[in-house]
């Protein structure tokens, strides 16, 4: 189980790195939405799949710390409309992404 977890986490981390090259906000948003879909999709999987794909891949792909940094930057820059839009899109988008994952 541990090698599968490590491999999946490495793949999730590499994908997040590639998505970060799109730019701030967009790359983070895509990574977090994709992780929501993946995690919801494997909810009933075997413990090995849940550990590898859910914890490893989706855990490494998603990024709470980068989201917090980006929101903090928007607050410091007093970009209130962007802050509200990004926060709302992330919350609502996450719910839609989970719903999509549950349909798989």
Swiss-Prot record:
It comes from the Bacteria. It catalyses: fluoride(in) = fluoride(out). Na(+) binds at residues 59, 62. The keyword Transmembrane applies. GO terms for biological process: cellular detoxification of fluoride. The keyword Transport applies. Keywords: Cell membrane, Ion channel, Ion transport, Membrane, Metal-binding, Sodium, Transmembrane, Transmembrane helix, Transport. InterPro entries: FluC (IPR003691). It is a multi-pass membrane protein. One of its GO terms (molecular function) is fluoride channel activity. The chain crosses the membrane at residues 22-42, 48-68, 82-102. Pfam families: CRCB (PF02537). Na(+) is not transported, but it plays an essential structural role and its presence is essential for fluoride channel function. It is found in: Cell membrane. GO terms for cellular component: plasma membrane. Fluoride-specific ion channel. Important for reducing fluoride concentration in the cell, thus reducing its toxicity. Belongs to the fluoride channel Fluc/FEX (TC 1.A.43) family. HAMAP family: FluC (MF_00454). PANTHER family: FLUORIDE EXPORT PROTEIN 1-RELATED. This is Fluoride-specific ion channel FluC 2.
């Amino acid at each position: 189980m541990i090698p599968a977890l490590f491999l999946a986490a490495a793949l999730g981390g590499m994908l997040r790195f590639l998505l970060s090259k799109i730019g701030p906000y967009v790359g983070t948003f895509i990574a977090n939405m994709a992780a929501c879909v993946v995690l919801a999709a494997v909810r009933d999987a075997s413990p090995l799949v849940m550990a590898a794909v859910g914890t490893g891949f989706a855990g490494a792909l998603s990024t709470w710390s980068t989201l917090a940094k980006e929101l903090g930057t928007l607050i410091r820059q007093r970009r209130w409309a962007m802050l509200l839009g990004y926060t709302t899109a992330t919350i609502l988008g996450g719910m839609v992404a989970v719903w999509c994952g549950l349909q798989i």
